[in-house]
A protein has these predicted regions:
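Low-complexity, glycine/serine/proline-rich disordered segments
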Residues: 1-68, 76, 111-129
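Functional cores of ribonucleases/endoribonucleases
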Residues: 71-122
């Protein structure tokens, strides 16, 4: 689990799409803010890559992560529990404010060219240690 040291700004990313582009163009900003993907402790489970991020405000952190990951999205489908955004390269970014597994917020990344969906859960303190 990686700890997010500062409290992120809360926001759902850009309200309207910025110039469209693929997910790869957002990885540098995700690395700066969250250490993605190298600093996260990835575990393989049921065909998915799972990681956890510790944050002072897990919902704000998940929202920030999803906003950065989906910057430049080409379409969005709102959900009761977040949103699904599609990138120009076909990558899908899903924000779930509350998951059915344990109630934590999570971001799912279905990255074009990868064989596993990446799921990042966000926790407060040592709740998942």
């Amino acid at each position: 689990m990686i700890a997010l040291s500062s409290k992120p700004e809360c926001g759902l990313g850009s309200p309207t799409p910025s110039p469209s582009h693929g997910f790869a163009e957002n990885v540098g900003n995700l690395k700066d803010a969250f250490g993605y993907p190298d600093d996260l402790d990835w575990k393989l489970k049921k065909g998915k890559k799972l990681a956890s991020v510790e944050a002072e405000d897990p919902i704000a952190a998940a929202t920030m992560f999803a906003g950065i990951a989906s910057e430049g999205f080409v379409s969005e489908m709102p959900r009761d529990n977040g949103y699904i955004r599609k990138m120009d390269d076909g990558t899908i970014v899903v924000l779930r404010v509350t998951t059915s597994s344990d109630g934590s917020p999570a971001v799912d990344l279905n990255i074009v060219g990868e064989s596993h969906i990446r799921k990042i859960h966000f926790y407060k303190g040592d709740n998942n240690a």
